[in-house]
Amino acid sequence: MESNCVQFLGNKTILITGAPGFLAKVLVEKILRLQPNVKKIYLLLRAPDEKSAMQRLRSEVMEIDLFKVLRNNLGEDNLNALMREKIVPVPGDISIDNLGLKDTDLIQRMWSEIDIIINIAATTNFDERYDIGLGINTFGALNVLNFAKKCVKGQLLLHVSTAYISGEQPGLLLEKPFKMGETLSGDRELDINIEHDLMKQKLKELQDCSDEEISQTMKDFGMARAKLHGWPNTYVFTKAMGEMLMGKYRENLPLVIIRPTMITSTIAEPFPGWIEGLKTLDSVIVAYGKGRLKCFLADSNSVFDLIPADMVVNAMVAAATAHSGDTGIQAIYHVGSSCKNPVTFGQLHDFTARYFAKRPLIGRNGSPIIVVKGTILSTMAQFSLYMTLRYKLPLQILRLINIVYPWSHGDNYSDLSRKIKLAMRLVELYQPYLLFKGIFDDLNTERLRMKRKENIKELDGSFEFDPKSIDWDNYITNTHIPGLITHVLKQ
């Protein structure tokens, strides 16, 4: 094991999937900034050809704000030269054998050159179509494993999963692997091949349906299969099956599985507050800031397990450094905060309310949006009752008026009905996390932190991933929400 992460990355050829996703970009920036002597980074991008892959690299990676520190340090021309020298954009798709690569010479070259494989590719939609979820999160993970096993210099496969494959279990949740066929329902057996066959059969039944009907039916089918086996949604179910396949078929390839919790904006590197897209917590924050969150389903005492993106990347690099070349190893790391530095939804609610009271968003009319703290309801029954009294009864009255006077309120009825259905569906999707009662044990991750401290050479804290260092009030109010407003809302 090499004790120094920067030295470890030097002269390595690395394959990274999942670009241009949020976490993959943070990882690429980190490597280029701290170890420009990395030999090569193969960056797998979903694209039909090399030209399209290069265009995605330029527009979705090279030109974004995340790289402004490197851009300022090196200058635009030197940064572009570094990226051209070190990054090889590869058009591909992990849901296809050999990662969807078509150039046989390129495949052979990659198999002969690659030292480390980092799989971040995933679909994270909770209610993803079952065929897509299986293709990417389950069998895509197996395709990456099979590709990695053919890399003659392959020292390690690092796979990014999610801590929430634990389902809705309460208590202390351990860093342990899933056994093939294990379920969370307890009284059922899971056969991944049967799940694949059922998915294919369902698609065959839908071949004469519209695209919209196929999409919705496959989403509902995935949710039904997940709940049958004890998982709350298609995302975590398909990720769990992906872990099972990797564990069973890894042979002697060193396998590290990183299970992050809810990933948030960067806390330190390359600069505080960078984020892309609305994550789980962010949808709540934005709705609150826009004055749309009058009532919300959550347990004020439940721990919301958050972890900044740069800490996840630091843990990934530290784990890769620790286990590279450890033949036969399968190591699992929870990367989160609930065990060492928990923050509750009630605290997050207070931080958010205080922020927008002092610094309100500006509405379309140019005036500050005045927000009220709103009501938190801690059970689905309470929330359903609230929705019935506040919205559904008025909707029924509007429906009756629409029947009697069909020309008067038809648009209002349809619009309100659609919004209520969407709100209830979102609440049902997020409910397992808003009322979550589990705490993610991070004993393995703590041992990794201790090992790094014993051998520490990165004295500047450039590979910090200890959640105890986070001041949640300061981070949420001075880093995360401002970053969200700047980089996502563009205000």
Curated annotation (Swiss-Prot):
Catalytic reactions of this protein: a long-chain fatty acyl-CoA + 2 NADPH + 2 H(+) = a long-chain primary fatty alcohol + 2 NADP(+) + CoA
Induction of expression: Induced by wounding and salt stress.
EC number annotated for this UniProt entry: 1.2.1.84
Q: In which tissues is it expressed?
A: Expressed in the endodermal cell layer surrounding the central vasculature in roots. Expressed in the hilum region of seeds. Expressed in lateral root tips, cotyledons, the shoot apex, young leaves, petals, stamen filaments, and receptacle of siliques.
Checking InterPro entries in the record gives: FAR, FAR_C, Far_NAD-bd, NAD(P)-bd_dom_sf
Q: Which SUPFAM superfamilies does this one have?
A: NAD(P)-binding Rossmann-fold domains (SSF51735)
- List each coiled-coil range: none
Q: List, in alphabetical order, the GO biological process terms annotated in this UniProt record.
A: lipid metabolic process; response to salt stress; response to wounding; suberin biosynthetic process
This entry carries the following GO cellular component terms, namely: chloroplast; plasma membrane
A molecular function (GO) term: long-chain-fatty-acyl-CoA reductase activity
Annotated keywords: Lipid biosynthesis, Lipid metabolism, NADP, Oxidoreductase
| CDD domains in the record | FAR-N_SDR_e (cd05236), FAR_C (cd09071)
* Enzyme superclass (EC): oxidoreductase
User: Its biological function?
Assistant: Catalyzes the reduction of fatty acyl-CoA to fatty alcohols. Catalyzes specifically the formation of C18:0 and C22:0 fatty alcohols. Provides the fatty alcohols required for synthesis of suberin in roots, seed coat and wound-induced leaf tissue. Provides the fatty alcohols required for synthesis of alkyl hydroxycinnamates in root waxes.
The entry sums up its family as follows: Belongs to the fatty acyl-CoA reductase family.
Q: Which protein are we looking at?
A: Fatty acyl-CoA reductase 1
Q: What is the lineage of its organism?
A: Eukaryota, Viridiplantae, Streptophyta, Embryophyta, Tracheophyta
Its gene is: FAR1
